[in-house]
Amino acid sequence: MKKFFGLALCGIMALAGSTAQAQSLSPSTKWHWDKGTIVVETPERPAGQEHALNLAVAPIKTVRVAFVGLGMRGPGAVVRFCRIPGVEIVALCDYEYDRAAKCQEELRKQGLIPADIYSGEKGYEELCKRPDIDLVYVAADWNHHYPVAKCALENGKHTAIEVPSAMNLEQCWSLIDLAEKTRLHCFILENCCYDDYEMNALAMAQDGVFGEIIRAEGAYIHSLEWFWDAYWKDPADNDVDNLHWRLKYNKENRGDLYATHGLGPVAQCLDIHRGDRFTTLVAMDTDPFFGKELVKEKTGKECKEFRNGDHTTTLMRTAKGKVVEIQHNVMTPQPYNRLFKLTGTKGYATKYPNPELALSGEALKGTGAPQVDNLNAHGFMSAEQRNAMMAKYYHPILKKYVEKGRDLGHGGMDFVMDSRLVYCLQNGLPLDMDVYDMAEWCCLAELGTLSMDNNCAAVTFPDFTRGHWNDQKGYKHAYATPEAEAATEAYAEAYSATQKEVAAKKNLWALYDAVKAAKEAGDAKAEAKAQKKLDAAKVAAEKAIEKAMKKATAKK
């Protein structure tokens, strides 16, 4: 492994300075009026560039990952990846060095090879130039999701981006073009697609339990009262009112800024860009009654302008005549709610406030649940009947991963998401979500703003696939053959075990501590000397792992 720690010390929770702050409305978006509807124009696909539907790359037996952004969400991702076989965490990056160093301790705890640490405004750029990284995992603040992902793709790295992965149409189209041009994955880290209820409901939908799904609802309703001051404050964001990045972004931007938690799972159930697509959008919001009061409370002065409404509602119609409603409210006090409702010709599903099902009696056949006379979906099923349905349609992906990650974030959905990402990369399969999902789920901010800024006018929804939305019939997860899956998992387990053995044998953490101690003492000469020893030991460790894995593979 080459040494980048010395020149590195780079990171992100901000990456401020030269990076322009994202806004809901992008200057490059072209649109015109047509009979009272705002028609958003779709840029032509560059010559020689092909779509990236079902994109698959050669299997990556050992996924070498770098994390950028270690404030709120990033540290949890590091913890999870430390527990996924066949992964090597190569680099940790945050604007603040101490945050990255703190995450390093999780690698020590698990006995893995120490990662190189990057910090500061531009460190992520140096990180992305490294030749020994397969995946850049972006969990920075919203303003820096796009620039880091763009840099990663331009430097030949797959990227996984926390939500929202793009803040406007310009960023959506840029990431699409980069993914299509480079043939690299651009994955949206939408964990709610891996929730137990949503995954089981998806399995039911795919088996026709609900009949034809005609309407769906999703939301992000979550009072952030206890979080506003915990969000990072970007030194270069001109945050004179000390609002921290997320409240400041809501103050300056309109639209559903966080649509993906609600939209992602229902879009999969409706086969969006896999046989259907969104065609028209209309958005409406309340005035920012709570938002203005919140700013006044924090600043002690009247808030004259607050762009985002307290509660935003977005309605979308599909090419096949379905309707989706998405809501956003991070202001008013109320219970957490993602809605997740499916209305079909044969049944109904809802997750909040309690998970329920209402189905015809036909749906219960073969589940082992007790039959009830004249069950006709006029009321919710009994708990016994519902549990029987959930058991029958318990998703195979949940069976494989969720119990291993129950305590690793949001009831296990985070671990399932990361495990599936690694699984698909290791087996050379299309990812569960592609760059078009990312664009479709993130573009509501700009499209909704266009609607609301023009008296809630109808807005056409771009076809991000540029003509290929009907090529694939139905949403599907990709799986390796049982034999290939077993071989990949055996290699991954062996690699992780070997990495731990070599890390201990080479005394890598003692060498890392010597670098850390010299740095804390301010002894640059001693730090450079210790760093040189650590670099050499890590190179030797990589060679030892490679030799051991070749030997193990040859035996088989």
Can you annotate each of these PLM segments?
Residues 2-8:
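Sec-dependent signal peptide recognition
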Residues 135, 141-142, 146-194, 208:
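Beta-strand-loop-alpha-helix segment that lines the small-molecule cofactor/substrate pocket
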Residues 14-21:
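C-terminal segment of classical bacterial N-terminal signal peptides
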Residues 326-337:
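Glycine-rich phosphate/pyrophosphate-binding beta-alpha loops
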Residues 24-110, 518:
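N-terminal Rossmann-like dinucleotide-binding module
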Residues 185-187, 192-306, 421, 455:
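Predominantly a Rossmann-like dinucleotide-binding segment in NAD(P)-dependent oxidoreductases
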Residues 24-39, 43-47, 75-76, 267, ...:
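C-terminal helical cap and adjacent loop that interface with cofactors, partners, or active-site loops
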Residues 117-133:
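A structured beta-alpha segment of the ubiquitous adenosine-cofactor-binding alpha/beta core
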